[in-house]
């Protein structure tokens, strides 16, 4: 594994301020633009604290949206990813109608998705280029020929913290508000993106209009304050192989035709494309930072007033439906709806009932309702 220590981190500085446009022509002749933004941030990630990092944000927008003004204030949306999969893979799958970002863009929204530090196309701290910073178990699984002893880490702590994630999000939010000349945006988040987006919103309610949270990783046991050591000791990062994703997904299949192999293939291809270094490890993996978490507590949630739509997949075994029901019960917002989505796992946006999810999010973002309801629980797809 020593050879992996020689892999160099990409220089973030050369990316700052760059924007690349890729027009996409839809089947119906309606042109979409995909714009790649790299936003400079003074990092608070402990391994690179004080350095300038580049946060990647993908924009999907209808070309006809054109000139933006204050009248479009409720039409800017920021997607925030979960613990493992970067945002551009999570929410912009390049297969048929599975791009959540594209669905909202076609409805007239200016849609962005960001990668926090260590994910996807954002800056990856150099310690993430060393496979010795994986857990012992993941090192041995990755080692060609089956190594019998793990190597010693060069960085023996979690790579990021929830506070550094909030800092990244805040930098992007402020950039987008200024870029589009609006005072608020809405946020859509998945899994660990729940504590990231809703935790940020709780601190800055004036900047967030509405929330849509798929499988929000809420726990009533979350610590209110940071641990004694920040970041916590342990692996700096984790990896996922194609076989890992297959196994994790398949154990959450609860109905026939829940997902298509072609969708899986599109997701995995995009995953590997987002991580050219990880693609060279073993049979190819995606890397993600380990995050020290705290702060998004039941007290914070009970004080939150931001209108929130939350969704739980009936077969989710990563964030159990009971946790999302707890979140609904604890949330202080007067306008809140919980969707119980049939035939769905943790990966609901890549599955059979993805359009029910997308349609509900659109109604929430435009009207603040689901099936006309401002509050309550809705069962869809049964």
Enumerate the language-model features and the residues they cover.
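Alpha/beta-hydrolase
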Residues: 221-311
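Alpha/beta-hydrolase fold nucleophile elbow
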Residues: 180-191
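N-terminal cap/lid segment of alpha/beta-hydrolase-fold proteins
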Residues: 27-72
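Short, surface-exposed "cap/lid" segments of acyl-processing enzymes
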Residues: 64-113, 123-126
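Alpha/beta-hydrolase active-site loop
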Residues: 132-179
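Catalytic histidine-centered segment of alpha/beta-hydrolase-like enzymes
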Residues: 344-355
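Active-site nucleophile loop of the alpha/beta-hydrolase fold
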Residues: 212-221
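Conserved alpha/beta-hydrolase "acid-adjacent" motif
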Residues: 317-323
């Amino acid at each position: 594994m020593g050879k992996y220590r020689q892999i160099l981190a990409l220089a973030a500085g050369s990316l700052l301020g760059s924007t690349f446009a890729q027009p996409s022509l839809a089947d119906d002749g309606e042109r979409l633009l995909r714009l790649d933004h790299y936003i400079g941030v003074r990092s608070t990630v402990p391994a690179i604290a004080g350095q300038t990092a580049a946060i990647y944000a993908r924009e999907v927008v209808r070309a006809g949206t054109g000139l933006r003004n204050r009248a479009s204030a409720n039409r800017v949306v920021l997607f925030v990813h979960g613990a493992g999969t970067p945002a551009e893979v999570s929410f912009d799958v390049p297969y048929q109608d599975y791009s959540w970002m594209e669905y909202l863009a076609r409805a007239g929204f200016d849609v962005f998705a960001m990668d926090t530090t260590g994910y996807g196309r954002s800056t990856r701290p150099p310690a993430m280029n060393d496979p010795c910073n994986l857990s012992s178990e993941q090192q041995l699984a990755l080692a060609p020929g089956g190594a019998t002893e793990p190597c010693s880490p060069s960085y023996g702590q979690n790579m990021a913290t929830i506070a550094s994630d909030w800092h990244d999000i805040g930098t992007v939010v402020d950039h987008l508000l200024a870029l589009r000349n609006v005072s608020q945006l809405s946020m859509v988040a998945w899994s660990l993106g729940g504590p990231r987006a809703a935790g940020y919103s709780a601190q800055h309610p004036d900047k967030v209009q509405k929330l849509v949270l798929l499988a929000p990783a809420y726990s009533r046991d979350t610590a209110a304050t940071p641990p004694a050591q920040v970041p916590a000791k342990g692996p700096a990062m984790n990896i996922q192989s194609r076989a890992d994703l297959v196994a994790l997904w398949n154990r959450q299949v609860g109905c026939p035709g829940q997902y298509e192999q072609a969708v899986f293939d599109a997701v995995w291809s995009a995953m590997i494309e987002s991580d050219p270094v990880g693609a060279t490890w073993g049979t190819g993996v995606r890397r993600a930072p380990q995050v020290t978490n705290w702060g998004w507590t039941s007290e914070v949630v009970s004080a939150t007033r931001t209108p929130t739509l939350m969704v739980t997949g009936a077969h989710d075994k990563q964030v159990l439906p009971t946790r999302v029901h707890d979140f609904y019960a604890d949330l202080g917002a007067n306008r809140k709806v919980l969707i119980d989505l049939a035939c769905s796992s943790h990966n609901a946006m890549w599955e059979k009932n993805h359009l029910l999810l997308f349609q509900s999010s659109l109604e929430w973002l435009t009207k603040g309702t689901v099936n006309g309801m401002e509050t309550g629980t809705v069962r869809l797809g049964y």
